[in-house]
UniProtKB/Swiss-Prot annotation:
One of its GO terms (molecular function) is RNA-DNA hybrid ribonuclease activity. The keyword Nuclease applies. Manganese or magnesium. Binds 1 divalent metal ion per monomer in the absence of substrate. May bind a second metal ion after substrate binding. It comes from Mycolicibacterium paratuberculosis (strain ATCC BAA-968 / K-10) (Mycobacterium paratuberculosis). HAMAP family: RNase_HII_B (MF_00052_B). It is an enzyme of class 3 (hydrolase). This is Ribonuclease HII. InterPro entries: RNase_HII, RNase_HII/HIII, RNase_HII/HIII_dom, RNaseH-like_sf, RNaseH_sf. Keywords: Cytoplasm, Endonuclease, Hydrolase, Manganese, Metal-binding, Nuclease. Belongs to the RNase HII family. Its cofactor is Mn(2+); Mg(2+). GO terms for biological process: DNA replication, removal of RNA primer; mismatch repair.
Amino acid sequence: MATTWPPRTVIRKSSGLRTLESALYRSGLGPVAGVDEVGRGACAGPLVVAACVLGPGKLESLAALDDSKKLTESVRERLFPVIRRYALAYHVVFIPPAEVDRRGVHVANIEGMRRAVAGLSLRPGYVLSDGFRVPGLAVPSLPVIGGDAVAACIAAASVLAKVSRDRLMVAMDAEHPGYGFADHKGYSTPAHSAALARLGPCPQHRHSFINVRRVANGSGGRVVADCKPDLPLQRDEGR
């Protein structure tokens, strides 16, 4: 009888972040890359996607790895340089708001995952994606629900994407004062909604989101003139 690989029981009953990756490495399917995104639900700023390949060994310096959303900012900042130092390869992709609007957030997310994996300096033997199937990859892949809490490579990618995006949003706050990007990181908070209503959208806002579109339509399409659509930090990075 045909079986699927990796066995679903490995995913459901994983006893640690390295269980699934270790099984893939033992089966000769490494290197294993994890891929994750941050900013999918934000109404401003880029969608940021990262891919990361960790070695098969366990590193004590990465013991704190988990879903980036569960970690404090200080822990994420501490892990960020450690991941970049010890990763066999990583690549971070920035999908600008205009492309998110043009493609739609889900399609942009999948495209970002493809770009992140393609940008790795080390070709993976297998790719684990957080939650979404990623068609069009050149290597076998598996979507893992809650993958950033199951696979260390996905958790590492999550941290890389989260810290990269948060730092960009802080820089964007200085470029576009008044919106509070450094605080809410582009997500729809009451403070952000109030600033959006007061100032109108800037080019970093996603018009495919109904709250932005409503404000833009209500203000006659007004866009803040001194908002700069491109920031130097919005470049893919990796090794």
